[in-house]
C-alpha cells in the first residue's frame, strides 16, 4: 500500500482582494470536490488577520496530486490576480510528482519536501460515520 501524499501551501492575499480570494477558493473547492473523488481531504483556511490563506490537501498517493494539478490548471494560471505568488510557502510530505516540482521550478517557488515515510496510518472517518 502506498502512503498518502500531503500538500500544504500558504499564500499572501493581495491587498483589496480578500472577497475575490474567498470567491475563487470556493470555486476551486467545488471543482475539486466534483472532479477528484479520490482526494481524501481538501481545505482552505484564512489567518486571523485575513491576509494569508493556507491550503491543506491529503491525497491517497502522489499520482493523485498530479491529477489535481491538471484539474486546477486554469485556476493556477489566474491565481496571481489575487495572490502574491512570490510569498508562498509549500510543504510536501511524500515524493512529489514531476508536474509539481516542474511547476515550483517554473515559478521559482520552494518546496519544503519530506519525502521519506516513516510510519503512520489513515482512517476513512467519513465512511465510518455513515455506517
Q: In which residue ranges do the predicted regions lie?
A:
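Short S/T/G/P-rich N-terminal loop/turn motif that feeds into the first structured element of a domain
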Residues: 1-53, 60-71, 81-131
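A short, acidic, amphipathic alpha-helical segment used as a generic capping/interface helix at domain edges
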Residues: 73-77
Amino acid at each position: 500500500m502506498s502512503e498518502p501524499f500531503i500538500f500544504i501551501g500558504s499564500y499572501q492575499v493581495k491587498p483589496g482582494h480578500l472577497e475575490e480570494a474567498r470567491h475563487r477558493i470556493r470555486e476551486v473547492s467545488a471543482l475539486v470536490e466534483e472532479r477528484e473523488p479520490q482526494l481524501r481531504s481538501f481545505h482552505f483556511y484564512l489567518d486571523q488577520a485575513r491576509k494569508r490563506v493556507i491550503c491543506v490537501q491529503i491525497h491517497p498517493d502522489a499520482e493523485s496530486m498530479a491529477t489535481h494539478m491538471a484539474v486546477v490548471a486554469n485556476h493556477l494560471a489566474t491565481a496571481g490576480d489575487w495572490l502574491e505568488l512570490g510569498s508562498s510557502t509549500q510543504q510536501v510530505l511524500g515524493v512529489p510528482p514531476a508536474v509539481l516540482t516542474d511547476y515550483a521550478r517554473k515559478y521559482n517557488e520552494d518546496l519544503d519536501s519530506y519525502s521519506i515515510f516513516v510510519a503512520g496510518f489513515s482512517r476513512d472517518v467519513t465512511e465510518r460515520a455513515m455506517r
